[in-house]
């Protein structure tokens, strides 16, 4: 069986669907891995790193023409611009594992089905223990929460931590996080580490303990929340 890894074509996309260490695992399992030249460059994985782990470097056309399973970060539905052009290269019987955004781009999914392609949409994998290793949303949400605070810290015209100097004292920044899912919790933790005073709110009262556990204050409002879920 052949696994193919094409370079991501969506504007601004720097991720790669398979890293060199994972290539080695697949090769040891008896699979052949084809990687488009330059697929991992933007993510910090040069071509020699893939070759050293057993992958073969090929053209984009060869990846789609030869691979039984195509691994992508964004499928044609979730991609933008040039990524949608990949649609014409999928062939009947091929399996595509990626984030496809089937609810946002149902026409793309219908086109894949019409071509006889089997598509697995990773963002729809349920958040259960058995599927934890395939939970792409939680890992990306963690990065998003972290990055959001870094952007805020760079944009805010004051420093995050309290600083005491001979010239006086600078009060810490106050951060308010709305929504305490995976991204929210990471944002809280990052802001706290940078020295800010952090408060957070979520419609789910059950997350109060999680907020307190990362050192923030949970803000409560007198709202009807009986129907709120207890998971983020």
Describe each model-derived feature in a short phrase.
Residues 67-68, 106-108, 129-133, 210-211, ...:
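Short, charged, surface-exposed secondary-structure boundary motifs
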């Amino acid at each position: 069986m052949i696994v193919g890894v094409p370079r991501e074509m969506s504007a601004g996309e720097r991720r790669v669907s398979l890293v060199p260490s994972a290539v080695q695992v697949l090769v040891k399992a008896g699979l052949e891995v084809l990687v488009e030249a330059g697929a991992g460059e933007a993510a910090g994985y040069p071509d020699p790193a893939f070759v050293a782990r057993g992958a073969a470097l090929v053209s984009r056309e060869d990846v789609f023409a030869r691979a039984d399973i195509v691994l992508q970060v964004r499928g044609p539905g979730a991609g933008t611009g040039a990524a949608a052009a990949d649609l014409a290269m999928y062939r009947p019987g091929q399996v595509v594992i990626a984030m496809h955004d089937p609810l946002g781009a149902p026409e793309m999914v219908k086109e894949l089905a019409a071509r006889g392609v089997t598509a697995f949409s990773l963002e729809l994998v349920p958040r259960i223990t058995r599927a934890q290793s395939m939970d792409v949303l939680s890992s990306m949400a963690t990065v998003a929460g972290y990055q959001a605070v870094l952007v805020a810290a760079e944009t805010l015209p004051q420093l995050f931590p309290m600083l005491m100097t001979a010239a006086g004292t600078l009060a810490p920044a106050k951060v308010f996080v709305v929504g305490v899912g995976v991204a929210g919790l990471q944002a809280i933790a990052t802001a706290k580490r940078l020295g800010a005073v952090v408060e957070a709110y979520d419609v789910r009262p059950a997350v109060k303990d999680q907020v307190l556990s990362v050192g923030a204050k949970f803000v409560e409002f007198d709202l009807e929340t009986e129907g709120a879920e207890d998971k983020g």
